[in-house]
Amino acid sequence: MRKNKIFIRVDSGTKVGYGHLIRCLALAEYLQKDWKINFISRSLPGNIIHELEIKKFQVFRLKSNSNRMNQKNDAEKSISLIKKYGGEKNLVIVDNYELSKQWETHVKPYVKKLIVIDDLMNRKHYCDLIIDQNLHTKMNGLYEGL
């Protein structure tokens, strides 16, 4: 049976840290029984992308000339990979503080569901679901308007 695919857009490196990638790796290990997991990640200085490859996940490396991200360009590269290697029922999970509604607006038409992992609540999103693993005392309405 052919598995549906998940594309996880996450970065790691000396400036952005490693927590996002480690969190997504744990999620991918859980989901891989029922889904084909693919990672999309920039090759930033000090990245730990090799941790994904050690676990036998498909990794698509986006070239990065600097630590500054162009969301539209990043979205176009991600869409190209999703169209080339995905199917009809793709799911995208994004865990990246540098990506927001601008990136999501470009990507969403090409996927069945778009899920954002965000715990900052400091930028607008255009997605089907926001996951915040933190416990907040007042969860109701916390993400309204984002």
Language-model segment annotations:
Residues 9-18, 23-30, 42-145:
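Active-site and donor-binding regions of nucleotide-sugar-utilizing enzymes
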Residues 2-7:
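Extreme N-terminal starter segment of soluble prokaryotic enzymes
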